């Protein structure tokens, strides 16, 4: 990762702190993974405070494949099976079957409908019967252990929500350029500056979590 580009956002610890503060205020953050991995940046919002306007931004500015990151226990509680029996994707991204709220949506594809689906899924007492399958929201199952187990955006999202003291559920979508190509770090930093969003990396979250563990030790 080109640290010189990230320098204006502070140290790894400061970047994570800025991201946590933004999430607590109901704002978005941009998280970039390793250059030798997917090398992409995701726009992430806390699921519990997600607004229709934020969902519209995810649809408009990103790839359109809006995903709901959930911890393993929530995926089990909702009885969401894997999208495929044998996951052969390059990075083992743990998609479950797609979902739709059974109540309160029309076609399910509008920003408002997708927000309704997400709020239905993350409700404390949500039941499998509250959701139709398939739908227009794509849940992702986070590995237990977070980024210390798997350095993916899914795990990074859940880690950030937990570190911020929020419900462990986040919404993400990959940032794209206007021509449809994937945004890389320079474009993601420009996007963050335009929309006043903090930028941090998966590596930053790893450093932050390890520092917390060291302090506990």
Swiss-Prot record:
Summary of the function given for this chain in its UniProt record: Catalyzes the conversion of D-ribulose 5-phosphate to formate and 3,4-dihydroxy-2-butanone 4-phosphate.
Annotated positions binding Mg(2+) 1: 38
Record's keyword terms, sorted: Lyase, Magnesium, Manganese, Metal-binding, Riboflavin biosynthesis
Name of the gene this protein is made from: ribB
Cofactor(s) the protein needs: Mg(2+); Mn(2+)
Pathway connected to this protein: Cofactor biosynthesis; riboflavin biosynthesis; 2-hydroxy-3-oxobutyl phosphate from D-ribulose 5-phosphate: step 1/1
Oligomer status and interactors: Homodimer.
Any single biological process term in GO: riboflavin biosynthetic process
Annotated family: Belongs to the DHBP synthase family.
Name of the protein in its database record: 3,4-dihydroxy-2-butanone 4-phosphate synthase
């Amino acid at each position: 990762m080109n640290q010189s580009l990230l320098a204006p956002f502070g140290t790894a610890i400061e970047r994570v702190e800025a991201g946590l503060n933004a999430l607590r205020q109901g704002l978005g953050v941009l998280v970039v993974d390793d250059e030798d991995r997917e090398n992409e940046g995701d726009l992430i919002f806390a699921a519990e405070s997600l607004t229709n306007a934020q969902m519209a931004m995810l649809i408009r500015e990103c790839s359109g494949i809006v995903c709901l990151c959930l911890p393993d226990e929530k995926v089990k509680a909702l009885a969401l099976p894997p999208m495929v029996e044998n996951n052969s994707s390059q990075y083992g991204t743990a998609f479950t079957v797609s979902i739709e709220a059974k109540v309160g949506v029309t076609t399910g594809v509008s920003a408002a409908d997708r927000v309704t689906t997400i709020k239905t899924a993350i409700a404390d007492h949500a039941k499998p019967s509250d959701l139709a399958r398939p739908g227009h929201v794509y849940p992702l199952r986070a590995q237990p252990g977070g980024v210390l187990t798997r350095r993916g955006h899914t795990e990074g999202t859940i880690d950030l929500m937990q570190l911020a003291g929020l419900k462990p559920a986040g919404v993400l979508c990959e940032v794209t350029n206007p021509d449809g190509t994937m945004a890389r770090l320079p474009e993601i930093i420009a996007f963050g500056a335009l929309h006043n969003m903090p930028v941090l990396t998966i590596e930053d979250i790893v450093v932050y979590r390890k520092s917390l563990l060291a302090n506990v030790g």
